[in-house]
């Protein structure tokens, strides 16, 4: 939640909220991974659908391309098609580590940005966007796939799914 008494600028608050969205996503992803086996991570409901493993690889690939290399104007080595290969058998531990490392790098990039830098233009995937747009795009993209991960987890576990957040727990942060 934003601190309404804070002396943060709008740009600082935007950066904080973008990073918080990723933190909330990771709470939910960790909750799902804690309930799933290695095999369930790579399950998909139909051959043409993505597995949770594919969604993690894809979300991290997008976060790196848009939020790290795109913002920094550094060499992009993303292999987008490889993120969707059904035979990509990366372990749960490796997938979570990939998320952790990618988010840590993204956090460093975002925190280093000045207000003026947020309005600088970049070309990412042949789209002309501001850095602010790139951050908004990639964090909401990550959160969207997080909800797909939750749906795939719930589909597999049914009534045995354990929520990461309960409304009666008295938590101060909004769940995504």
What are these regions (language model features)?
Residues 1-6, 93-97:
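Long, acidic, intrinsically disordered low-complexity segments
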Residues 35-42, 109-119, 154-160:
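Surface-exposed helix-capping loop/turn segments at secondary-structure junctions
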Residues 28-29, 120:
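A short, ordered amphipathic alpha-helix with a cationic face
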Residues 35, 58-61, 101:
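Residues within well-ordered alpha-helical secondary structure of globular protein domains
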